[in-house]
């Protein structure tokens, strides 16, 4: 698929579908498509859940209200099972992370050529529709979690307690301060990196498989592989949203523990 209508080779087709709609260059490059889709999906989440909350009834609930209540209950039970402190932010944060990431992941279930083709009709040459397959998005979300970890670590333990945790753990002796600081710093920094890269890697791989199926097989045979993979991928997109949420809760629970 190309804007001029010529037939692309498999290699060109794959490269085209992996190219973002971008502005800027170098370090300051911004992936417009990832930004737009993530904001739109986040807005959709807020609008939908607020609409259900406003129209919620104590009588016989509708299907949408039942679904939202199930999601609320699932996230709330997960938070209570992991986070044992008292913090009004954790449950709403966990709900936002789970639903938002799930919606971004679910974009991978759309037909691979549908939205990019509509974009080309509108003279938009490139379009990637899965925000969570963009490492900039996943690492940005993980960085937000990292700042919360630092904030609550300092708030609960104080600056002195936080520094002591970095310098006196795991070896509680002044002679091991450099080793402790190195180990704890690596551990602390690895949390957001692993959190973001795990989500990115799984979603990028899933997107790549759909692209490879579309690029390598004739259209009439793609369904034989696309449908089974899409069904299996539903589990992946849900599981990755759940893992990101759970690890966020675990990290914040550790940050809020007093020593």
Curated annotation (Swiss-Prot):
Primary site of residence: membrane
Residues passing through the membrane, by range: 29-49, 89-109, 132-154, 209-229, 230-250
Keyword Lipid metabolism: no
GO biological process, one term: proton motive force-driven plasma membrane ATP synthesis
Signal peptide (from-to): none
Subcellular location: Cell inner membrane
InterPro entries hit by this protein: ATP_syn_F0_a_bact/chloroplast, ATP_synth_F0_asu, ATP_synth_F0_asu_AS, F0_ATP_A_sf
GO CC, one annotated term: proton-transporting ATP synthase complex
Molecular-function GO terms, alphabetical: proton-transporting ATP synthase activity, rotational mechanism
Keyword Transmembrane helix: yes
Membrane topology: Multi-pass membrane protein
Pfam families the record matches: ATP-synt_A
Keywords, in A-Z order: ATP synthesis, Cell inner membrane, Cell membrane, CF(0), Hydrogen ion transport, Ion transport, Membrane, Transmembrane, Transmembrane helix, Transport
Function: Key component of the proton channel; it plays a direct role in the translocation of protons across the membrane.
PANTHER family documented for this protein: ATP SYNTHASE SUBUNIT A, CHLOROPLASTIC
Quaternary state and interactors: F-type ATPases have 2 components, CF(1) - the catalytic core - and CF(0) - the membrane proton channel. CF(1) has five subunits: alpha(3), beta(3), gamma(1), delta(1), epsilon(1). CF(0) has three main subunits: a(1), b(2) and c(9-12). The alpha and beta chains form an alternating ring which encloses part of the gamma chain. CF(1) is attached to CF(0) by a central stalk formed by the gamma and epsilon chains, while a peripheral stalk is formed by the delta and b chains.
Family: Belongs to the ATPase A chain family.
Name of protein: ATP synthase subunit a
Species lineage: Bacteria, Pseudomonadati, Pseudomonadota, Gammaproteobacteria, Aeromonadales
Gene: atpB
